[in-house]
């Protein structure tokens, strides 16, 4: 997989916009690529420590730290209010999780019914990015073991949350739902970037998913920010690898 911080859109030449040179993807291709993806992503922190990609890494780390500091001040409001009950019902963790998992499947089936290999490949890439993002998120959660806001009483201490969660019950940092949502949004935005409405809708829905994780008290704002950035970078990197294909 390409560098996780190579965020510049890949330009398409006139030949690339009309000729597809890459064979269509399948589930076997995605599974084979996952190992390479994960090796590349888990090697990134070591490169960052050595000073590589500082322009992308430093702002991300600094913003995450700032949000972590603010978590103990902003999270109690969401822990104590019931103003978001309707929104929380519409964007429950179960609903958003199912939607993320079923979206690539639906696009694959639609692409096959319409004999649209570009749509089918887009769906496989979306599934690849989703799996990559979820693996990163879940492993990170088991390393940081951060309590969820819902694990803390409304009048409790929201400042002492790290390395206190039960290893088997689930932890908070980063948000897996948000990482998955932004990974999907980034893939489809890259693949269908000629349709100006796609990025607006894709990233708009992903943002709503991220906000719901805060109002549901499943995550702190810093968890959501970190998950969104990680998912977005992963999705963009995966989604721009095959832009030489013929697309809409």
Feature names for model-found ranges:
Residues 82-89, 121-124, 226:
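Non-cytosolic membrane-interface motifs at loop->transmembrane helix junctions
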Residues 57-65, 101-105, 126, 130, ...:
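Alpha-helical transmembrane spans of integral membrane proteins, capturing the lipid-embedded, hydrophobic core
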